[in-house]
Amino acid sequence: MKLAKLGVSAAAAAAALLIAAPALAHTKVVKSTPAAQATVAAPKTITLTFNEKVVPAFSSFELVMVGHDMKIPVKTTVSKDNKTISGSPTAPMMAGAYKIKWTAASADGHRMKGEVPFRVR
């Protein structure tokens, strides 16, 4: 009898984990232009594509030149499908190392942050 109750409890716990698993997923970048660690000519447009829809009001990125802590102004927009954030630098980009520092909120309100490093030749 105790063994049967234990089996039912284990099955219920496993079912709860399976149901909760999608809620534990976090917003993350699945593709970027420029790609992480790439060396490129100064990009005219920067794009970040996410694994799930993001909330436009709480999702954007900034462009920072590493070592100088110099921010390059970028006005970002979110695509109609809410999975891609794009932006064009409004100032010239010198040769050197950069980071795309992003923040994105998913539909459940959970905010994530990350960086995509790249170099301009």
Q: Where do the PLM segments sit?
A:
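Bacterial N-terminal signal peptides that target proteins for export
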Residues: M1-A11
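N-terminal signal peptide c-region/cleavage motif recognized by signal peptidases
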Residues: A20-P22
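N-terminal edge beta-strand
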Residues: L24-A42
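Short, surface-exposed alpha-helix to beta-strand junction/turn motifs within ectodomains of secreted
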Residues: I46-T47, K53-P73
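Extended, polar beta-sheet/loop recognition surfaces of beta-rich domains
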Residues: I46-T49, G109-R121
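Surface-exposed, short loops/turns at beta-strand junctions within beta-sandwich domains
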Residues: A91-A95
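A short tyrosine-centered beta-strand micro-motif
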Residues: Y98-I100
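Beta-strand-rich extracellular modules
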Residues: T103-A107
